[in-house]
């Protein structure tokens, strides 16, 4: 079973090492920074009646005051996280990118 708090902190540290400022509690920070949160969703997958696999989906919402360079860096950071992560929503309003990132972690 994955420890969600540790995974949240691992992703926070990873993004900070890439130069982003990360807030896990959506506090408003100075312009040009990133916010992140991870929401657990537990599901079960069954290929047949004998095989069950549970997985946990971690959803991260990132809010970035955006320049073209910042946006490109964010997409590169997402690609570095792992093959299990992908951006499934991207909304741009008033120079702010709101990007939702989803990844599966298998138990």
Curated annotation (Swiss-Prot):
Changing residue 17 to D: In c2-Q3; confers partial resistance to bacterial AbiQ. It comes from the Viruses. Keywords: Early protein. Seems to be involved in escape from killing mediated by the bacterial type III toxin-antitoxin module AbiQ toxin protein upon infection of L.lactis subsp. lactis strain IL1403. A single variant independently isolated from 5 different phage confers on the virus the ability to partially escape killing (i.e. the virus grows in the bacteria). This is Gene product 19. It comes from Lactococcus phage c2. The gene is e19.
